[in-house]
Amino acid sequence: MLLPIVVLVGLPGAGKSTIGRRLARALNTELVDSDELIERATGKACGAVFSELGEPAFRELEAIHVAEALKSSGVVSLGGGSVLTESTRELLKGQDVVWIDVPVEEGIRRTANERSRPVLQAADPAEHYRNLVKVRTPLYEEVATYRLRTNNRSPQQVVAAVLHHLEID
């Protein structure tokens, strides 16, 4: 069975999709984004699907598409909350999983005005984001083989760090 070259995880706004696209280009391979698989399957934006189904049903649907994405031999980018599902965490065992770890204040800044992410909709978005950090950090720690802190790094520097981790530089 083929395994992805690398799987990217991290909070909303961490830059998984941006880094994934650039990394796939650098490796001359495909990017499979689990959020895009959901959007293709439903014909709707992920945020709309999340709002319509509610989080538990969305996570079930997401787990199906994560399993599909992990059959790729390229770069895989997972939705920020995908690690909440135990079956996804099990599937990530044995994979090279890079946690794109964005500083909390940067993540808040990047997602503050995004209406397309219902998981972040709250009376106090900054406090809600901090709560996501608290809940998800132990799960990212569980699945990640490499934690890449993006502090003050450009996307090019993050890609270079992932390539170095993969010993492809």
Curated annotation (Swiss-Prot):
CDD domains: SK. The keyword Signal does not apply. It catalyses: shikimate + ATP = 3-phosphoshikimate + ADP + H(+). Its EC number is 2.7.1.71. It holds the Pfam family SKI. One of its GO terms (cellular component) is cytosol. Mg(2+) binds at S17. Pathway: Metabolic intermediate biosynthesis; chorismate biosynthesis; chorismate from D-erythrose 4-phosphate and phosphoenolpyruvate: step 5/7. Substrate binds at D35, R59, G80, R136. It is found in: Cytoplasm. SUPFAM superfamilies: P-loop containing nucleoside triphosphate hydrolases (SSF52540). ATP binds at G13, A14, G15, K16, S17, T18, R117, R153. Binds 1 Mg(2+) ion per subunit. The keyword Chloroplast does not apply. Keywords: Amino-acid biosynthesis, Aromatic amino acid biosynthesis, ATP-binding, Cytoplasm, Kinase, Magnesium, Metal-binding, Nucleotide-binding, Transferase. Its cofactor is Mg(2+). Monomer. Catalyzes the specific phosphorylation of the 3-hydroxyl group of shikimic acid using ATP as a cosubstrate. This is Shikimate kinase. The gene is aroK.
